[in-house]
Amino acid sequence: MHKIDIDLVNMTLDVMKYAIDRISVTEPKIGIPQKEEDLKALVGETITDKGIGGEVAFNLWKEYLMKANVSIDHPRHLAFVPASPTRAAIMFDLVTSASSIHGAYWMEGAGGIFCENEAMKWIVSLTGLPEGAFGVFTSGGTAANLSAIVTAREYWRSLNDQNKVEKGLIITSIGAHSSIKAMAKVADVDILLVETEEKLTGTALRHTIESLTFHQRKRLFAVVATGGTTNAGIIDDLEGIAQVCEKENIWFHVDAAYGGGALVADSVRHLFNGIEKADSVTIDPHKWMFSPYDCGAVLYKQPKLAMNAHSQQGSYLDIFKDEGAHGFNPTDYQIQLTRRVRGLPLWFSLATHGTDKYKEAVERGIELAQIAGRMIEENPNVELVREPS
């Protein structure tokens, strides 16, 4: 399986041709999902004792299986939260896989981690977080949010012995992403949802905290604000929420997985005022920073607190923490030990195009939303439910 022969060479050429053709297409076929039994009837048994051969397997992919996927980079794919990775990022995703880099520890992945960190410095600079703030790339917003809340929970538990035996409580809005509720289950903390049709404000948060019982208030350790809700792009009152969290000594997390890319746009940057006061921030480069799936990011005002929460110990890991292997170890700041250097495609795209191009692209997206809003208003057959953010 690992030898280099003529079959491997031919397969490599076929795969590279396919990749080049796919990258070169500006309007790929949208694709149509099919039932599992229908796909099975088309391709038959693909996993067998002797194998079906690379050529046959690849042809099945091209002829049947690829066509059962919806191409989310199609220019008219407007549903859900589509991704539109740059060609540079897509190409370097190939390089990332081909390079076979383990991105957990500096000792094994110094070059790749260096590139990730260069991209991360840019993201951190967009938030305005204070000197010393930093972050790591994750598999997505769910892993980033979970990593942040576990960090917050462990910090809260470290404050006194009573917190170690209490079940923590977090507050967020009803419009928060589903991953907040999911990660609360995993982190074994309770969640209180603030009912609001619009954004969560500092005033609403303060009233919610004042309505808590004495015991609930003792268990409250974090507030999760949203920097762009999934359904409507609503950005919470980050400044007001930050002020309440600071006064109440509560961890302030901002889930900007969806909207965080807009931090680069001067026209809407003011909507995120207050994010610079967060204790942690989630941003997904695979959404509005034009990276291929999967690439999330979690940022910390005090990375040391994340290290205290996530650094794994084991005799087999000691060598990675030896002085001779000293460097930044991404695994110490999030829940995953094994990780690919998923920030590499973003780094290459940024290095290729420059940050000004990113700003132009995001501003253009905002402009298109405004144009779409006006077109809907002018059309008597449809109704504009909400003004573009």
Question: Locations of the language-model features?
Answer:
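Short Gly/Ser/Thr- and Asp/Glu-enriched loop/turn motifs at secondary-structure junctions
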Residues: 131-132, 385-389
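Active-site catalytic microenvironments for nucleophilic, acid-base chemistry
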Residues: 22, 122, 126, 151-158, ...
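Conserved redox-cofactor binding core of oxidoreductases
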Residues: 84, 88-91, 137, 143-147
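A residue-level signal for conserved active-site and pocket-lining positions in enzyme catalytic cores
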Residues: 9-12, 119, 148, 184, ...
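Conserved PLP-enzyme active-site core in the AAT-like
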Residues: 140-307
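N-terminal entrance/gating region of PLP-dependent enzymes' catalytic architecture
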Residues: 1-132
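Active-site C-terminal subdomain of aminotransferase-like
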Residues: 274-380, 387
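Glycine- and acidic
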Residues: 1, 99-107, 130-136, 166-167, ...
